[in-house]
Amino acid sequence: MASTGASRSLAASPRPPQGRSSRQDKYSVLLPTYNERENLPLIVWLLVKSFSESAINYEIIIIDDGSPDGTREVAEQLAEIYGPDRILLRPREKKLGLGTAYIHGIKHATGNYVIIMDADLSHHPKFIPEFIRKQKEGNFDIVSGTRYKGNGGVYGWDLKRKIISRGANFITQILLRPGASDLTGSFRLYRKEVLQKLIEKCVSKGYVFQMEMIVRARQMNYTIGEVPISFVDRVYGESKLGGNEIVSFLKGLLTLFATT
């Protein structure tokens, strides 16, 4: 269960205004979670704050993969606090991977735009209004957050991890020529119908799924805008990126190079 202090502060937050026009754009946030009980209350609070202050119509869909740490129970509390029309819990019984989590989540999305992001506070919701402005300005099909353009950056990583990340991104740029500066990032805004079509085409699982989405988007001539973001390493919990994920990334990169 979430801590008493966190629950009190969340409960004190005003509910977002209701009764918006059905013709207004609506944004569905997909939040896959696994062992994120410490991070989930704060990321949801930040999302609600950002959307409410900008008068943006939204819903937050939490896809929990059977977390043993009580993440699901925290999500249930958040739905009670903010309302089941704003916080939708759509859990799965076990850990099935990031790509299938998005497939599961989009089935329940009622917005005409879908935002995907990490639940571990690596992606700050303060950038979402800028994503939306960028999409409107260029009428883009996709807006992707980038760590490698403009004033974007990474914070909290040691030098070794930064070099690995930069190196991986450099290699993918050479091999795949994706038309985007940050191929491995996971903070994006999609038109819902575009995301649905891309999901149908993608075959990768896990973290490679994000990379394939941009590559397939280029193949299908979808337009991509970019917004520089600050990526901050998680404060609570453990990183999901391990040796198996790195091997999967390399295999996925070679597969995409051979098939695209």
Swiss-Prot record:
Residues 1-25 are annotated as: Disordered. Component of the dolichol-phosphate mannose (DPM) synthase complex composed of DPM1, DPM2 and DPM3; within the complex, directly interacts with DPM3. This interaction may stabilize DPM1. GO terms for cellular component: dolichol-phosphate-mannose synthase complex; endoplasmic reticulum; endoplasmic reticulum membrane; membrane. Transfers mannose from GDP-mannose to dolichol monophosphate to form dolichol phosphate mannose (Dol-P-Man) which is the mannosyl donor in pathways leading to N-glycosylation, glycosyl phosphatidylinositol membrane anchoring, and O-mannosylation of proteins; catalytic subunit of the dolichol-phosphate mannose (DPM) synthase complex. Transmembrane segments: none annotated. This is Dolichol-phosphate mannosyltransferase subunit 1. It holds the Pfam family Glycos_transf_2. Pathway: Protein modification; protein glycosylation. Its cofactor is Mg(2+); Mn(2+); Ca(2+). GO terms for biological process: dolichol metabolic process; dolichol phosphate mannose biosynthetic process; GDP-mannose metabolic process; GPI anchor biosynthetic process; protein mannosylation; protein O-linked mannosylation; response to oxygen levels. Belongs to the glycosyltransferase 2 family. The modification Phosphoserine is found at S3, S9.
